[in-house]
């Protein structure tokens, strides 16, 4: 005989006499409580100052900030999804106090109320809280960068080289047409050539030619059509070329639909053909896997972002960290000089750091780095024992305006040298070498720091600091592409990502502490 099956009580329409509050449905150690507690401690007066009095009441900015930050913690980046969760999710209902702003209100708050440095100030306050809690010390920065795609389409590119080439061709064509017209006018009336407009004002020059042609009754239809084409087509095109170059500024490219995005080569290259995509170079500094600073830059290379990034750290916290750890993408003379002048210990690799440890490199006597150098008399000695005296200096200026000095050394005579084939392959009779002594001294000091006990410890931590943070953000939380346009809004968006990352880690720490206390009470 089968036993009777018993089910637990189930009645959807059974109302409680005293309904539970939403807070009772949320665990004590849930991350949403951490978000609420941290944001309640923030000074949001800068955001409140953007609201105007009178009119309809507004949703509270602290509530909207909590909803957006918690959404980014939960991998929710869309305003429409946030709106839906405010109707469906208990955590969102509790966090918002049952307020239900629509997606337009959420998006407007995110892109307009948090801009102009207001969100950066909130991020600074949270990092200061972490510092007071002992989670970060702000004495060391592990710096790294990654490229994140813009929301713009990859086929919206505008290239500086193409614009400059087409602009020069069109200017030459316009000039030829106008000169041909002016020569005809000069034959009819020599006085008109005396007041020829300058090339700087093509529009006035074209109008003047057409006016003179009407006054003198020039019947050359082909020439007139050419001048009218210059006025109607060529001049507007030159104006558009000028605007493209103004938007581009120092960059080599930009996107038509996100004017601040620059085309860069991304690591995520599905076609494996090196195709460039519009994006931003995102730089972060971490400590104990907490993001302490972030920046958005248009330069694709990391070395050009380091100095402004370190400046932003000092401006944000009023102090500078004593140690900086970074990979070889940041190791150049300008960055080393900046860190030395600001009292920063640079645990920063340079491009040949690992190659110098190889036996093949150390045994190659033809390399400048392995030649004997007499510092007092300023000469090098080649593998055949011949002196290479200094014969001059060369100067170069980087894209950022940093001036470098290189000394040139040249051998006295290399004719008949049995080692010439291995030494150099140039057709000139004597080998010359170029040495940047200042850069070499920076590299020597960097190697001493990196190979010290402290340096070995910091180097071993670097792969699990910013690189692990980027991996967590991109692959665990799916943030591989910005959803807002312009540098101004992209800074807000990545700032939200950074704050969400920090609060996730901080919430995990608090949860472990709470579990530890509960375990201690249970064992008493």
Predicted regions and their residues:
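Generic alpha-helical segment signature
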Residues: 15, 28, 40, 60, ...
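A short, ordered amphipathic alpha-helix with a cationic face
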Residues: 8-12, 56-57, 82, 94-95
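Short secondary-structure transition/capping motifs
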Residues: 24, 56-60, 71, 75, ...
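Anion-binding and metal-coordination hotspots
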Residues: 3, 9, 68, 75-88, ...
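Hydrophobic alpha-helical membrane-insertion signals
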Residues: 2-33
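Catalytic micro-motifs at enzyme active sites that drive phosphoryl/nucleotidyl and oxygen chemistry
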Residues: 54, 93-97, 126-128
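Short helix-loop boundary/capping segments at the starts of domains
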Residues: 37-48, 73-76, 88-95
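Basic, short loop/linker segments at the boundary and entry of helix-turn-helix/winged-helix-like folds
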Residues: 27-69
């Amino acid at each position: 005989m089968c036993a009777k099956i018993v089910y637990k009580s189930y009645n959807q329409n059974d109302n409680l006499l005293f309904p539970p509050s939403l807070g009772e449905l949320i665990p004590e150690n849930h991350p949403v409580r951490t978000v609420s507690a941290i944001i309640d401690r923030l000074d949001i007066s800068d955001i409140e100052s953007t609201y105007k009095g009178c009119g309809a009441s507004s949703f509270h900015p602290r509530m909207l900030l909590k909803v957006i930050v918690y959404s980014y913690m939960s991998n929710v980046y869309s305003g429409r999804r946030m709106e839906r969760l405010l109707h469906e999710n208990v955590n969102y209902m509790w966090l918002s106090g049952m307020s239900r702003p629509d997606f337009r209100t959420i998006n407007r708050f995110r892109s307009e109320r948090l801009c102009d440095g207001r969100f950066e100030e909130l991020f600074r306050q949270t990092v200061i809280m972490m510092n007071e809690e002992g989670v970060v010390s702000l004495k060391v920065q592990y710096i790294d960068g990654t490229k994140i795609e813009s929301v713009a389409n990859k086929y919206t590119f505008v290239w500086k080289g193409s614009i400059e080439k087409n602009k020069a061709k069109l200017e030459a064509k316009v000039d030829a047409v106008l000169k041909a017209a002016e020569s005809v006018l000069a034959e009819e009336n020599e006085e008109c050539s005396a007041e020829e407009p300058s090339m700087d004002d093509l529009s006035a020059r074209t109008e003047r030619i057409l006016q003179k042609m009407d006054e003198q009754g020039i019947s050359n239809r082909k020439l007139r059509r050419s001048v009218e084409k210059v006025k109607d087509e060529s001049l507007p095109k030159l104006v558009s070329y000028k605007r493209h170059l103004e938007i581009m500024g120092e960059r080599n490219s930009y996107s038509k639909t996100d004017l601040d995005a620059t085309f860069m080569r991304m690591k995520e290259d599905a076609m494996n053909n090196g195709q460039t995509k519009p994006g931003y170079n995102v730089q972060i500094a971490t400590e104990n896997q907490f993001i302490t600073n972030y920046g958005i830059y248009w330069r694709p290379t990391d070395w050009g972002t380091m100095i402004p990034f370190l400046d932003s750290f000092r401006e944000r916290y009023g102090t500078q960290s004593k140690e900086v750890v970074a990979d070889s993408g940041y190791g150049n003379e300008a960055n080393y000089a900046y860190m030395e002048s600001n009292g920063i210990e640079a645990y920063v690799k340079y491009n040949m750091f690992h190659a110098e440890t190889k036996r093949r490199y150390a045994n190659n006597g033809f390399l400048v780095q392995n030649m004997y150098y007499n510092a007092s008399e300023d000469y090098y000695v080649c593998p055949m024992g011949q002196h290479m005296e200094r014969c001059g200096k060369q100067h170069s200026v980087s894209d950022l305006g940093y001036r470098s000095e290189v000394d040139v050394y040249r051998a006295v005579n290399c004719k008949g040298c049995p080692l010439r084939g291995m030494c150099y392959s140039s057709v000139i009779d004597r080998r010359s070498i170029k040495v940047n002594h200042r850069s070499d001294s920076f590299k020597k000091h960097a190697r001493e720091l990196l190979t010290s006990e402290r340096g070995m410890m910091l180097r071993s931590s670097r792969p699990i600091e910013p690189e692990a943070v980027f991996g967590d953000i991109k692959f665990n939380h799916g943030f591989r592409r910005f959803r807002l346009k312009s540098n101004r809004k992209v800074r807000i968006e990545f700032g939200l990502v950074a704050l969400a990352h920090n609060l996730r880690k901080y919430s995990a720490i608090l949860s472990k502490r709470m579990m530890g206390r509960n375990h201690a009470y249970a064992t008493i």
